[in-house]
Amino acid sequence: MGQLDNTIVVFTTDNGAENITFPDGGTTPFKGGKLTTWEGGMRAPLLVRWPGQIKPGTVKTEIFAALDWVPTLVNIAGGPKGDALKKQIESGQYPGIVKTTLDGVDQTEYLAGRSEKSAREVFFYYTGSQPSAVRYKNWKFYYTMVPDTATGGLYGATTYHWTQIVNIKRDPFEQTVGADAKSLLAYAGSIGSPSTAYLYDWNILPIGQLLWTKELMSYKEFPPMQAPETYNLDGILKAMQQSGHRSQ
């Protein structure tokens, strides 16, 4: 058996298409792009070669986050399995440098085809350090979003007056959510759809609230390690003013 037969090859990217630099940055059929929490900014291609485990040509459509690679590859390499790695990290045993938590989940069974379901049911979307949206299974809850234009990620996020929610499998291109006129018209059309579907969407709103409450409460024991940098003009000018001095 050669070395390649004992090696997992992963080809992916860290974000959706950077359509602000089209055509070099790529394009996507999904809404938004890099620097946004729309699906166009979060969905990324993923190719995996794992001889003897993943059959060539296999297509998987369940949730898989880049965060999941750490516990998954550690498991495959012979390290702690399942939640064991997370427990070690939270107790400060591993890597022994800092006490924190692990947001990834072990996806070994899903990748190997021993489970048809992903081990991940929830994914949190952040705009910088600001909670933006959350996905639970096929449902995505929207709270604070940037414009879905190519340059939307360069501007501040807008907090919606009410939570928007959509079945992302039913509307993968997010046509019925957003603040632009086209989205609002589509949203109105969805209200006119079978009332059972519309009412069901709104009846599960507490799920998103409970998920975010649990996520934010975890900051008490495991606070963010550092604040993200700001790239908006106001923040840059303020930093320049604070670092300089007035002429005498």
What is each PLM-predicted segment?
Residues 8-13, 46-47, 69, 73-74:
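Beta-strand elements within well-structured catalytic alpha/beta cores of enzymes
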Residues 3, 66-69, 73, 103, ...:
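Stable alpha-helical elements in mature extracytoplasmic
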